[in-house]
């Protein structure tokens, strides 16, 4: 089903009366009868909100945005794109234009355009510029009016290896050793919106699964994309319980239990039994601000089995996404000896650091006499100074000294972090400084990430 023609139409005009060229956009709607979908598409092409509706999405893809957020109010609507984790506001829309484009998307997805309060969800697949995309739509009422969120994802993952994520070889070697071990628990974690699902998938796909049997137990309603060579088993309401599924899986004698969540005390106790008696292994994940927070959450969330879980913990991976400097326009500068000392870098070891090229705002693009001057904008990053993201990783190895520290300082996480740093653990600051020294990112961006922004 092709949505939009490149030929100009007198119906496709902007508010200023100029003709709008609407890009081709193939749309395949999920959960809508094919004949019904065709009828909806034909009808929507005649609506005034069709051009801005299509351009909203195609411009987002061209901009590399992975989210589109629209907030409606009585006066109008404000749309924002999220590019490399940073929200960028678009010019404000009048209410009529915003309502018109929203009607189009709700009609396309088989939703109710008149419903502005209850949550509505839809999904469609599209091919744009020879790339397959899956785009989710959600609208819901909020006190100020209505909020709409588009989530844009590639159908086929681009990131496939730990190197693609930005993980150093030494960290990869340690992590793979943990994942390929036995008689223990490995935790993969990250703050919300910092790429945990992607790292979870890639870490598991890069573990050795050819000589060992890996199984994943998950709630069916939370089902995620398949992970290569990991056999999935699901529990669900109205079907087999988690305990019933685990009992069936245990009979198959897998080597590694993959648990996106620890589910409950019965499952935790059962897996711990397999680890101690059968030398099995477990990998789990959790949303957490850092490695210390991740393990503390797991221990406090399972008080009955906290001691046993701490006893089998082998390592905790945590990550934060950070923007990469644009290779086409980044600027080198010579750091002062004082700055190098502050960063913990030996004098003379790093001759150059890099910073982004950010053009001045339009009102400052004038000469000494106030005449406007032309400022060249980087065509690759469009003046953002950054292009794409990588991850900074901290991998906390849990040995007997660490277990003792967690047991004693679990209620004093800041003191625990201080102990871990004194023990030589390389955290986000150290990893970030190394990334800056390699010219991958800037000190300004590192500071933003360390402040949790």
Region locations from a protein language model:
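Short, flexible helix-loop junctions that flank or precede catalytic/ligand sites
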Residues: 2-3, 20-29, 37-453
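N-terminal acidic, proline/glycine-rich, low-complexity intrinsically disordered segments
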Residues: 1-12
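Long, low-complexity intrinsically disordered linkers/tails
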Residues: 13, 17-19
């Amino acid at each position: 089903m092709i949505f939009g023609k490149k030929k100009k139409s007198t119906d496709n005009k902007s508010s200023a009366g100029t003709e709008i060229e609407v890009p081709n956009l193939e749309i395949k709607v999920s959960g809508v009868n094919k004949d019904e979908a065709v009828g909806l598409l034909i009808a929507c092409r005649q609506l005034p909100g069709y051009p801005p509706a299509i351009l909203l999405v195609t411009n987002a893809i061209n901009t590399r945005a992975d989210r589109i957020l629209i907030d409606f109010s009585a006066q109008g609507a404000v749309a924002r794109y999220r590019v490399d984790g940073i929200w960028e506001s678009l010019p404000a829309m009048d209410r009529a234009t915003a309502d018109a484009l929203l009607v189009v998307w709700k009609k396309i997805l088989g939703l109710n355009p008149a419903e502005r309060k209850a949550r509505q969800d839809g999904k469609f697949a599209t091919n744009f510029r020879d790339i397959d995309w899956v785009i989710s739509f959600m609208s819901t009422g909020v006190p100020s009016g209505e909020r709409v969120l588009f989530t844009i994802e590639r159908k086929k993952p681009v990131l496939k290896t730990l190197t693609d994520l930005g993980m150093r070889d030494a960290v990869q070697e340690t992590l793979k050793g943990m994942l390929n071990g036995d008689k223990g628990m490995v935790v993969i974690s990250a703050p919300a919106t910092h790429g945990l699902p992607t790292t979870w998938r890639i870490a598991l796909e890069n573990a050795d699964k050819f000589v060992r049997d890996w199984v994943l137990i998950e709630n069916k309603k939370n089902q995620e994309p398949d992970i290569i060579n990991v056999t999935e088993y699901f529990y669900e309401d109205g079907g087999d319980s988690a305990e019933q599924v685990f009992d069936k899986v245990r009979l198959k004698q897998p080597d590694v239990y993959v648990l996106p969540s620890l589910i409950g005390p019965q499952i935790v106790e059962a897996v711990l039994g397999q680890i101690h008696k059968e030398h099995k292994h477990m990998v789990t994940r959790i949303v957490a601000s850092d490695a210390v927070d991740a393990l503390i959450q797991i221990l406090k969330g399972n008080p009955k089995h906290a001691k046993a879980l701490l006893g089998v913990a082998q390592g905790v991976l945590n990550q934060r996404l950070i923007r990469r400097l644009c290779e086409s326009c980044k600027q080198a500068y010579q750091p002062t000896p004082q700055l190098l000392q502050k960063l913990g870098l030996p004098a003379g070891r790093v001759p150059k650091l890099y910073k982004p090229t950010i053009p001045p705002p339009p009102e400052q693009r004038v000469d000494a006499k106030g005449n406007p001057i032309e400022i060249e904008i980087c065509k690759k990053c469009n003046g953002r100074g950054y292009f794409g993201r990588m991850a900074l990783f901290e991998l906390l190895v849990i040995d007997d000294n660490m277990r003792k520290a967690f047991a004693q300082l679990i209620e004093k996480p800041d003191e625990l972090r201080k102990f871990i740093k004194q023990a030589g653990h390389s955290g986000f600051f150290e990893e970030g400084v190394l990334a800056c020294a390699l010219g991958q990112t800037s000190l300004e961006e590192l500071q933003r990430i360390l402040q949790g922004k």
